[in-house]
Amino acid sequence: MTELKNELIRHSAADLAAKLASREVTAVEVTQAHLDRIADVDGQVNAFLHVNSEEALAVAAEVDAARAAGGSAAEELHALAGVPIAVKDLIVTIGQPTTAGSKILEGWHSPYDATVVKKLRAAKMPILGKTNLDEFAMGSSTEHSAYGPTRNPWDLDRIPGGSGGGSAAAVAAFEAPLALGTDTGGSIRQPGAVTGTVGVKPTYGAVSRYGAIAMASSLDQIGPVSRTVLDSALLQEVIGGHDPFDSTSLTDPFNDLVAAARVGNVAGMKIGIVKELHGEGYQAGVENRFNESLQLLKDAGAEIVEVSCPNLKYALGAYYLIMPSEVSSNLAKFDGVRFGMRVLPKDGPMTIERVMGATRAAGFGDEVKRRIILGTYALSAGYYDAYYGSAQKVRTLIQRDFDAAFAKADVLISPTAPTTAFKLGEKLDDPLAMYLNDVATIPANLAGIPGLSLPGGLADEDGLPVGIQLLAPARQDARLYRVGAVLESILEEKWGGPILAQAPDLKTAVLGAVSTTAGGSN
């Protein structure tokens, strides 16, 4: 049985779906295998903030009962019914706490489900639990979580990326075949790059944001985390579609993603190298894997062209004015009055202003406070036009740069992150160094275009995963899945299998970490 469980957790979501449909395995067996894996390794990885065993197994049992009954009950099941999934703890769920990685929401339970969660429930996908993140999704390493950092399954002393390091680590550690994340400046794609997983930021508005606790509303986007490009396509088709509860939701159906992932060729497609998104400042091992991917795509029949987006050099600066400005506004609701923690001032008059001040001082971490201060300043009278207004003008220029680039290429390509995963604590006291991790991912959020990161191999210097990023015009998410699936297939042929097959045995790593800790305490 142990061998069966170990085999089950390593299957892709698509493979699990096929095995479930043929009744080769049961949904309860699949779900229990992943719950057992969480119990075995998550004490060291810390990918999950909450595990929902009882509900997940109950949903799995419903799926098994429907398949056993046959007839219409079985026919009406979604293709992914019974395939378990993890959800980033920024997305609200009935019956489970939603903390946003913050002390200010510790123990809070939402009275409603996010739209994407409703869709998971409708598809009867067992929700394993809620994953760790940087507080309110503000960070690039998951070290800013109030509940401790998540560790990278490739090396437990390294970061798993952020803000959605919990979702990426859960998938990389085989604790879940699929996960949901949110991406405001790279929070799905950058963790994907450093953990060897696939992360997708859909077109802005392609997936409803209703029920995702807002960080920066004009930038936030929910998207899939998986181990294969096809799995991400399958999940995006589940969670996508128009939602009247989200005023920015698109009416486009986006129902051609799985078909695109199965096309199997890139012959005749033009793939543009973004001049400003590689080269100086990028780790040599990252550049080497990037150049290999370019050659492989060229060998597969794609035409490689170079494009320039000159205003991308201003993207980081514009982002760190727009994003904190929206953070300042969105986080004003967390005041200790209606929900979340409440801290009373120790002395003096008990006014609502003083209660709010005491609550926010105690409930928010340093990074959240830093961004609220930056945003409040940027929006203040006398500075609005100089900072926020100017940043929005730069955003328009970046959008125009992408329009021009896509007139020359079907898809753009770059490294996802400038380096591989760095050591825990290495950049925690240097905000600028931390912010630079998202230099290649931020532009897609500013422009509202879709982006996909897939594993591009291992860096020569440290043997850690490198991510390759693909970008497409708005509403053309299918192009990402077509090119991504082909590149993934070619790379896996080169490696002799999926990149995660080369990851260290996590159980051995965990046992080693436990032994080291025990030895150090003597």
UniProtKB/Swiss-Prot annotation:
A Gene Ontology molecular function term for this protein is: ATP binding
For the keyword Calcium, the answer is no
Establish whether keyword Membrane is in the entry.
Answer: no
Its BP terms in the Gene Ontology are:
translation
Keywords of the record, alphabetical order, are: ATP-binding, Ligase, Nucleotide-binding, Protein biosynthesis
Quaternary structure note:
Heterotrimer of A, B and C subunits.
Please give the name of this protein. Answer: Glutamyl-tRNA(Gln) amidotransferase subunit A
| Organism in which the protein naturally occurs | Paenarthrobacter aurescens (strain TC1)
